[in-house]
């Protein structure tokens, strides 16, 4: 693993710049240290009467963004949650889930942790912020507890994943993004997948799903978990199918159950489980143009038709919940019947399954298991709102987690843009987490650069939705960017962007190619020194 050690632990290469500082905010209830990045600005900016010479940024990079931490991938990350002194098994006789404690009125370390993360040390700014007349308050541990107790938010954090830095998924919080990685029978290695997982976190992924279907599924997952500061999700059906020799008809409940327990023991934080696809839905799916495009859904459909029996994930769902409850694993109820083409969007198969997911949500909550609902898929723009409205109504306001939606079927090679457009819209309506799509979607297995493109595109979508929802911290970052842009403070512009390394390199190369070597020019190569609108606007304002 020598190469992967270098590739995942090396600092990001920067061009003549001061890297963001890693800072830690301490808890007041528990002995927590919540990591963030702090960007030092080249000047002091005044926003709404407050001075900002630096800005704390939400950081998903964990120890990888702290140059003072030495990381050995073979040993894994520090198990930070082991030192928090909250012994769940001593406090609960039957359940140790976040929802259990939330319903009991107990704040856990994870609840305080995510409240600190969401505020980013900007409580004063948040309290003074107002857009459209609505006042906003900082996130408190008590508010987090209430949202989890009501099922409107989840903290996916398996007790066996102590390396994890807790995060929260819910529509009252920052919109999150997930990055899918994983090998296939046709390519990739453990080293490559670990590298993609780590760099997903460094580029801004809030969770990572390991969707490996090829060789060494168990070992790949173990390496990823021990080196991941973000929640890891899986689709257990993939490994169960491997154990069944790749034959859907050979699957059994016992095989699947044992796979669940195996992955739970390793520390997987949330499982996608396709328990909502039923025999009654299959005739509707067979009428579609593109049928069933979910891998897990197609596996279960084949099993049901072969055995002429109901989906065992549905009939055994209470037993599944009892397993998840023991480890505090969240369930992501999979949309086995998501549309794979816009012609199939919002059909009877899709919404029929969604109603079943709502029923299963209530079952999971009975066992105090945290739930989120997976959504489409391929949906044209004008049909996206209906998906959000129906999810809230059918699924009792459980967090929605969507794959896009992709708004057209003809964007192959650019499906990360396709997905980000639909994702921005549905997130502005209340979707809690967006599953990224890379440029390789529909074409092949993504490499590290594809992962980067997918993550950043969906960070743009999530941030845009946060602005639409009036998130004060997001608005501050945009205002500071605009002030830096109008001041020609290039280094501040780089550091306040979602991908500082890329835009810094693009700017430097563009200027150098045209013979400009100025450190802080009052123009860029788009307009040049004589046609810069902001430069002329400033000059006009300064004229008497």
From Swiss-Prot:
Zn(2+) binds at residues 378, 442. The keyword Lyase applies. Substrate binds at residues 180, 209, 238, 274, 294-296, 335-338, 374, 401. Its cofactor is [4Fe-4S] cluster. GO terms for cellular component: cytosol. Pathway: Cofactor biosynthesis; thiamine diphosphate biosynthesis. It catalyses: 5-amino-1-(5-phospho-beta-D-ribosyl)imidazole + S-adenosyl-L-methionine = 4-amino-2-methyl-5-(phosphooxymethyl)pyrimidine + CO + 5'-deoxyadenosine + formate + L-methionine + 3 H(+). Keywords: 4Fe-4S, Iron, Iron-sulfur, Lyase, Metal-binding, S-adenosyl-L-methionine, Thiamine biosynthesis, Zinc. GO terms for molecular function: 4 iron, 4 sulfur cluster binding; carbon-carbon lyase activity; zinc ion binding. GO terms for biological process: thiamine biosynthetic process; thiamine diphosphate biosynthetic process. Belongs to the ThiC family. This is Phosphomethylpyrimidine synthase. It comes from Pelodictyon phaeoclathratiforme (strain DSM 5477 / BU-1).
């Amino acid at each position: 693993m020598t190469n992967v050690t270098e590739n995942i632990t090396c600092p990001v290469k920067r061009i003549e710049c001061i890297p963001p500082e890693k800072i830690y905010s301490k808890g007041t209830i528990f002995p927590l240290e919540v990591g963030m990045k702090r960007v030092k600005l080249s000047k002091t900016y005044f926003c709404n009467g407050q001075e900002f010479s630096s800005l704390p940024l939400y950081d998903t990079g964990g120890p990888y963004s702290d140059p003072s931490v030495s990381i050995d991938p073979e040993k894994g990350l520090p198990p930070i949650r082991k030192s928090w002194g909250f012994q769940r098994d001593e406090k609960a006789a039957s359940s140790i889930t976040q929802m259990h404690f939330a319903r009991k009125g107990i704040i856990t370390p994870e609840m305080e942790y995510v409240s600190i993360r969401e505020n980013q040390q900007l409580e004063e700014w948040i309290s003074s912020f107002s857009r459209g007349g609505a006042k906003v308050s900082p996130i408190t541990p008590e508010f987090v507890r209430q949202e989890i107790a009501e099922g409107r938010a989840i903290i996916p954090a398996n007790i066996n994943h102590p390396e994890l830095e807790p995060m929260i998924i819910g529509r009252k919080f920052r919109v999150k993004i997930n990055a899918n990685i994983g090998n296939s029978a046709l390519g990739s290695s453990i080293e490559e997948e670990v590298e993609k997982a780590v760099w997903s976190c460094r580029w801004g992924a809030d969770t990572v799903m390991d969707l490996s279907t090829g060789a060494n599924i168990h070992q790949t997952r173990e390496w990823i978990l021990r080196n991941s500061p973000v929640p890891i999700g899986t689709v257990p059906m993939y490994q169960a199918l491997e154990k069944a020799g790749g034959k859907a008809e050979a699957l059994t409940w016992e095989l699947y159950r044992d796979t669940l327990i195996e992955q739970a023991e390793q520390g997987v934080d949330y499982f996608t489980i396709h328990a909502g696809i039923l025999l009654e839905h299959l005739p509707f799916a067979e009428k579609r143009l593109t049928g069933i495009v979910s891998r897990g859904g197609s596996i279960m459909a084949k099993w049901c038709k072969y055995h002429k029996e109901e989906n065992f994930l549905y009939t055994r769902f209470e037993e599944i919940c009892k397993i998840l409850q023991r480890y505090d694993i969240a369930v992501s109820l999979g949309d086995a019947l998501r549309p794979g083409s816009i012609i199939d969007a919002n059909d009877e198969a899709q919404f029929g399954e969604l109603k079943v997911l709502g029923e299963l949500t209530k079952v999971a909550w009975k066992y105090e298991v945290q739930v989120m609902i997976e959504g489409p898929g391929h949906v044209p723009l004008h049909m996206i709102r209906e998906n959000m409205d129906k999810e809230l109504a059918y699924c009792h306001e459980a967090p929605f987690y969507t794959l896009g939606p992709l708004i057209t079927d003809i964007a192959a090679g650019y499906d990360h843009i396709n997905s980000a457009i639909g994702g921005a819209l549905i997130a502005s309506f209340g979707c809690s987490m967006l599953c990224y799509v890379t440029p390789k979607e529909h074409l092949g297995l993504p490499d590290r650069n594809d992962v980067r493109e997918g993550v950043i595109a969906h960070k743009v979508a999530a941030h845009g939705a946060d602005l639409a929802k009036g998130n004060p911290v997001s608005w501050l970052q945009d205002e500071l960017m605009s002030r830096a842009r109008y001041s020609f403070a290039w280094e501040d512009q780089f550091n306040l962007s979602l991908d500082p390394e890329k835009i810094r390199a693009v700017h430097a190369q563009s200027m150098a190619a045209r013979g400009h070597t100025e450190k802080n020019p009052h123009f860029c190569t788009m307009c040049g020194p004589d046609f810069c609108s902001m430069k002329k606007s400033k000059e006009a304002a300064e004229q008497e």
